[in-house]
Swiss-Prot record:
Top EC group: transferase
Organism of origin: Rhodococcus opacus (strain B4)
Record function comment: Catalyzes the ATP-dependent phosphorylation of L-homoserine to L-homoserine phosphate.
Keyword Kinase: yes
EC number(s) recorded for this UniProt protein: 2.7.1.39
Reaction catalysed by this enzyme: L-homoserine + ATP = O-phospho-L-homoserine + ADP + H(+)
Keyword Hydrolase: no
Transmembrane parts of this sequence: none
Pathway given in the UniProt record: Amino-acid biosynthesis; L-threonine biosynthesis; L-threonine from L-aspartate: step 4/5
Protein name: Homoserine kinase
Length: 314
């Protein structure tokens, strides 16, 4: 039975950015980054009021089709509650369409806010972390970014076909993820270009098949990445090598590709962040001052970021 939330309940969700793939872990590996959007949701007597501040304020719809609103509604439905009206304020810091998981963060933040409202009504109605991973991944189609924003740290994610009770295929896959505790010596630097990238476009550049040797190469590097991230950061250079997607996307990301080469030549493990165009660098040393100056002179924003915890509500 659906319960109605009283007017006047307020929850704020603070949700981190994320980077997916980390080189070899295409659609599998992710990491939460210390760059945060905030979503404040208040239940009201009727209607929907939404306000967007910061990134995307002039680009996203201010209405029921907004991704955060859709995620809130899905979260309320999953928790078995309903609100007669909602006031939603989105304070966006994560750059949009740059490969930093802004859409996943919007979804996770909306779901977490809805979950927080349900818990205020009855703690027994709260959704588990596994449920939040599942729900957020359904929006995205794969859980690498979404699960990183839910769980924090680095994540290994996967999916499998779901089944109904009668054995027929389910309408959605089953999504899962486990969090990894990142080695404390690892530093994260994001080099963010001014231009945007389309995930759909860059995915369209990928071939339908790959040579067996390239698949085997990425399997080895993906396994090594787990070791490098948690225990052996000295292996990050080898652990971030890839043959499945970065070279294939290079024509669409010339600045990104060039900067990955520059950083790797300097001994810094660098990859495309998600679908780009942001460059993700993983290192155990301070980022070189001269490289920062060079990047900024070319219009790149250089962000030194912590590895973040997962979404939090208050």
């Amino acid at each position: 039975m659906t319960q109605t939330l009283p007017a006047g309940l307020t929850v704020t969700a603070r949700v981190p950015a994320s980077s997916a793939n980390l080189g070899p872990g295409f659609d599998t590996l992710g990491i939460a980054l210390g760059l945060y959007d905030e979503i404040t949701v208040t239940t009201t007597a009727s209607g929907l009021n939404i306000r967007v501040e910061g990134e995307g304020a002039d680009d996203v719809p201010w209405g029921p089709s907004h991704l955060v609103v859709r995620a809130i509604e899905r979260g309320l439905e999953s928790a078995g509650v309903w609100a007669d009206g909602l006031d939603v304020v989105c304070r966006n810091v994560i750059p949009h369409s740059r490969g930093l998981g802004s859409s996943a963060s919007a979804v996770v933040g909306g779901l977490a806010a809805a979950n927080g409202l349900a818990i205020k009504l009855d703690p027994e109605l709260g959704l588990s972390l596994d449920q939040l991973v599942q729900l957020s991944s359904e929006f995205e189609g794969h859980p690498d970014n979404a699960s990183a924003s839910v769980l924090g740290g680095a994540v290994v994610s996967w999916s499998c076909a779901g089944e109904q009770a009668d054995g027929a295929p389910a309408a959605t896959d089953i999504y899962s993820a486990v969090a990894l505790k990142v080695h404390p010596a690892i530093r994260v630097v994001a080099l963010v270009p001014g231009e945007r990238s389309s995930t759909a476009h860059t995915r369209g550049l990928l071939p339908e098949t790959v040579p067996h040797r390239d698949a085997a190469f990425n399997v080895s590097r993906g396994a090594l990445a787990v070791v490098a991230l948690t225990e052996r950061p000295d292996l990050l250079m080898a652990a971030t090598e890839d043959r499945l997607h970065q070279t294939q996307r290079a024509p669409a990301l010339p600045l990104t590709t060039r900067w990955i080469a520059v950083l790797r030549k300097a001994g810094i493990a660098a990859t495309v962040s998600g679908a780009g165009p942001t460059v993700l660098a993983l290192t155990t040393e301070p980022f070189p001052v001269e490289l920062r100056a060079q990047a900024e002179a070319e219009g790149l924003q250089v962000l030194e970021l912590d590895v973040a915890d997962g979404v939090r509500t208050s």
